[in-house]
């Protein structure tokens, strides 16, 4: 065997050097090193030529190429070549880490895939990279790698949150206090990718038919998860009752905001305490005190933004507080109005129910956490159910939710925020 020893091969003209002819084999002996540091190498078997990022719903793949695929906006179906040679390699990678939201489907295009002609393979794991090699007609394309690649450093992003408890209900019959609004709390916290955050949405308290029974208090709303400071908003306190001749149910109940006290000729009820349990900033306000004498009047339930009015005044429910977590200003957690003979209180802004002279009191607004309105007629109004809302950057929204929340993208001043509105219990995986 002839041997040629040189330190450098340079072209006699131009910039290309050709080694041998088609079909020739060049062996690199065991232990030798082929150093291509700093060079651009193309066309070597097993090394794909990487293409620009694919964002479309379909792609026709070519052997020897690598494809970064972005499924942020839509799923993608890749059609493999109709014919292939042994050793052909194609690579697909989850460019935006969104395969779990919008999957990659591979159309086999008549060739086998792992020895099967159907069904088409689907890759739906976040961060997945799929490298396939064509082996032969029997097995066809074989994945040499189809695993997920975890981030070496946990990825985090900021989320704005609104948590509103369920509003309180009211007594029935006459002179009842309005229901207190559910607690109103906001928070901005850091979420970590792949961790699960659990949401509970509180129901409104029940309105009752008896004038000797105070309305039911609302239930708590909360969000919790690993590394998260749990935020809990209390349910609104139930409105106090006329409760004649006894006096055990005249006071409004404590809660996120307190229920209004019931009216009575000699011993009216006191308003329930808001911000119970205590939080900073305060999650709500006190209910008003009922009025004695003629005409006796139930007081308004407390709202997130104001105390309920006393029965000696208007008996109106306290106004709620506004939040822009959805991208626009919405007012939540208004207190319910108290009832009296000839005069009834209005519900506070933010879903508080109005009191009525006849029929049933108005219910607090669902998913605003408003307190129910009292009545001089039949059943007291029920409190409105609470709500939990998350606002995260569009670019980081994972799409992994349970409990059927309403999800709206492209919100906020920059049209780049995703709003996740939970109207019932559920989870969000970041």
Where are these regions (language model features)?
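Beta-strand-rich receptor-binding modules of extracellular spikes/adhesins
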Residues: 2-40, 128, 136-153, 311, ...
């Amino acid at each position: 065997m002839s041997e040629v020893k040189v330190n450098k091969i340079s072209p006699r003209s131009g910039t290309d050097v050709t080694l041998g002819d088609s079909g020739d084999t060049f062996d690199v002996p065991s232990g030798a090193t082929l150093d291509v540091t700093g060079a651009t190498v193309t066309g070597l078997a097993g090394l794909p030529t990487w293409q620009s990022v694919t964002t479309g719903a379909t792609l026709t793949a070519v052997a020897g190429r690598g494809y970064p695929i972005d499924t942020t906006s839509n799923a993608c179906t890749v059609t493999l070549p109709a014919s292939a040679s042994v050793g052909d390699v194609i690579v697909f990678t989850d460019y935006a880490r969104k395969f779990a939201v919008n999957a990659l489907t591979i159309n086999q295009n008549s060739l086998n895939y792992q020895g099967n002609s159907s069904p088409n393979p689907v890759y739906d794991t976040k961060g997945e990279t799929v490298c396939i090699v064509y082996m032969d007609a029997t097995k066809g394309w074989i994945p040499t790698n189809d695993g997920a690649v975890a981030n070496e450093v946990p990825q985090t992003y900021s989320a704005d949150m609104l948590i509103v408890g369920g509003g309180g209900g009211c007594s029935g019959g006459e002179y009842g206090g309005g229901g207190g609004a559910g607690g109103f709390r906001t928070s901005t916290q850091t979420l970590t990718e792949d961790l699960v955050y659990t949401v509970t949405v509180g129901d409104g308290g029940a309105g009752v038919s008896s004038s000797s029974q105070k309305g039911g208090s609302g239930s708590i709303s909360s969000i919790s998860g690993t590394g998260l400071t749990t935020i809990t908003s209390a349910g609104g306190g139930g409105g106090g009752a006329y409760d004649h001749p006894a006096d055990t149910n005249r006071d409004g109940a404590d809660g996120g905001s307190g229920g209004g006290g019931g009216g009575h000729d000699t011993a009216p009820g006191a308003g329930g305490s808001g911000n119970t349990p205590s939080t900073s900033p305060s999650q709500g306000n006190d209910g008003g005190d009922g009025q004695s004498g003629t005409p006796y009047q139930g007081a308004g339930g407390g709202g997130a933004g104001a105390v309920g009015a006393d029965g000696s005044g208007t008996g109106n429910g306290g106004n709620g507080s506004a939040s822009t977590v959805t991208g626009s200003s919405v007012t939540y957690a208004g207190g319910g109005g108290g009832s009296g003979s000839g005069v009834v209180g209005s519900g506070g802004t933010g879903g508080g129910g109005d009191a009525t002279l006849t029929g049933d009191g108005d219910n607090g607004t669902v998913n605003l956490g408003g307190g129910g309105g009292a009545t001089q007629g039949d059943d007291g109004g029920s409190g409105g159910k609470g709500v939990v809302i998350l606002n995260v950057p569009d670019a980081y929204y994972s799409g992994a939710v349970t409990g059927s929340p309403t999800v709206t993208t492209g919100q906020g001043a920059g049209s780049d925020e995703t709003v996740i509105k939970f109207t019932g219990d559920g989870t969000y995986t970041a």
